[in-house]
C-alpha cells in the first residue's frame, strides 16, 4: 500500500512512523509512506498558505492553490489509472471505526489531507476529497494526529504486518466486541491470582471464558456495540443475566 500525506508539518510524523510496527512494516515494504509539505507548493513570495475567511469570522482558512497543486503533484507521482481515495481529517467527518479501517486497508493507495487553522477552503473538499473522517467528538489543532491514528490502524490489518492473523482478529472491535483481559507470568503477584481456567490447558473452556469476558466488558463499557450483534443462544442468555443484575 502507498500512503501519501499532505501536511504543513511533515516532521510530526517522524517519531510515530519511525518506531515499532509501522517502522517494521515499511522495512518489509508492506506499506510505503511519504509526507508532502503543502507550503512547498505555495506560489506567493512568502509561502503563505492561509487567508481570512470571506464573510468574516475568527481564524484563518487554508487556501486552495497550494493544496490543489500538492495533490496534483502526488497523484502524478502515483501514476494512477483511476482516482484514489483522498481523506480529509475533519471533526465534521464520519467517525472512524474498525470497520472503516478494514475497508481502507483493502486500498492500494491512499491520500490523507491534514487541515489546520479554521480548516480548508470548501472548494478543496468539493473537488478533491472523497472521504471526511473524524476520530472523535473533539477538536484538535490539525489533522496530523488523526492521520497517524488511522494509518496505524490500517497498517495492522495489512497481511504480513502482524505475526499472525489472530493477533488482530482477537483485538477489540474486530469481532464487534471489546477484547478480553490478558494475563502473563507470574501466576500470582502481590496476592493477585491468574484465573484458573487460563491455566487448565482446556482450550474450549479458555475460549468460552474469553468470549464471556468480552461480552461482559462490552456490556459494561460499550453496550451500544451489542445492538444488532448476532449472539449465540447461551451468549444472549449471558447478556440477559447481566441486564437483570443491573436492574
From Swiss-Prot:
InterPro entries named in the record: Alpha/beta_knot_MTases, tRNA_m1G_MeTrfase_C_sf, tRNA_m1G_MeTrfase_TrmD, tRNA_m1G_MTases_N, tRNA_MeTrfase_TRMD/TRM10
Record-linked Gene3D superfamilies: 3.40.1280.10, tRNA(m1g37)methyltransferase, domain 2 (1.10.1270.20)
GO CC terms in record: cytosol
GO biological process: one example: tRNA N1-guanine methylation
Entry's EC annotation: 2.1.1.228
SUPFAM superfamilies in UniProt: alpha/beta knot
UniProt binding sites for S-adenosyl-L-methionine: 115, 135-140
Taxonomy, superkingdom: Bacteria
Reaction(s) catalysed (UniProt annotation): guanosine(37) in tRNA + S-adenosyl-L-methionine = N(1)-methylguanosine(37) in tRNA + S-adenosyl-L-homocysteine + H(+)
Localization per Swiss-Prot or TrEMBL: Cytoplasm
Keywords: Cytoplasm, Methyltransferase, S-adenosyl-L-methionine, Transferase, tRNA processing
Any GO molecular function: tRNA (guanine(37)-N1)-methyltransferase activity
Keyword Nucleus: no
Pfam families assigned: tRNA_m1G_MT
Subunit structure: Homodimer.
Task of the protein: Specifically methylates guanosine-37 in various tRNAs.
Protein name as annotated: tRNA (guanine-N(1)-)-methyltransferase
The organism of origin for this protein: Alkaliphilus metalliredigens (strain QYMF)
Gene: trmD
Amino acid at each position: 500500500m502507498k500512503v501519501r500525506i499532505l501536511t504543513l508539518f511533515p516532521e510530526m510524523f517522524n517519531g510515530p512512523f519511525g518506531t515499532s510496527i509501522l517502522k517494521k512494516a515499511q522495512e518489509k515494504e508492506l506499506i510505503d509512506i511519504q509526507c508532502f509539505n503543502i507550503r512547498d507548493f505555495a506560489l506567493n513570495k512568502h509561502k503563505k498558505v492561509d487567508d481570512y475567511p470571506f464573510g468574516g469570522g475568527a481564524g484563518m482558512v487554508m487556501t486552495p492553490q497550494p493544496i490543489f497543486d500538492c495533490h496534483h503533484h502526488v497523484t502524478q507521482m502515483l501514476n494512477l489509472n483511476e482516482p484514489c481515495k483522498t481523506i480529509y481529517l475533519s471533526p465534521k467527518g464520519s467517525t472512524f471505526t474498525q470497520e472503516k479501517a478494514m475497508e481502507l486497508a483493502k486500498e492500494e493507495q491512499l491520500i490523507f489531507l491534514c487541515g489546520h487553522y479554521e480548516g480548508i477552503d470548501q472548494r478543496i473538499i468539493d473537488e478533491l476529497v472523497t472521504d471526511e473522517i473524524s476520530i472523535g467528538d473533539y477538536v484538535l489543532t490539525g489533522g496530523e494526529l488523526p492521520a497517524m491514528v488511522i494509518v496505524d490502524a490500517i497498517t495492522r490489518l495489512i497481511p504480513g504486518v502482524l505475526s499472525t492473523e489472530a493477533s488482530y482478529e482477537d483485538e477489540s472491535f474486530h469481532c464487534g466486541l471489546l477484547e478480553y483481559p490478558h494475563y502473563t507470568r507470574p501466576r500470582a503477584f502481590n496476592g493477585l491470582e491468574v484465573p484458573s481456567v487460563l491455566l487448565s490447558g482446556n482450550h474450549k473452556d479458555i475460549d468460552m471464558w474469553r468470549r464471556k469476558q468480552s461480552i461482559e466488558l462490552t456490556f459494561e463499557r460499550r453496550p451500544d456495540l451489542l445492538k444488532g450483534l448476532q449472539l449465540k443462544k447461551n451468549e444472549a442468555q449471558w447478556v440477559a443475566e447481566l441486564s437483570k443484575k443491573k436492574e
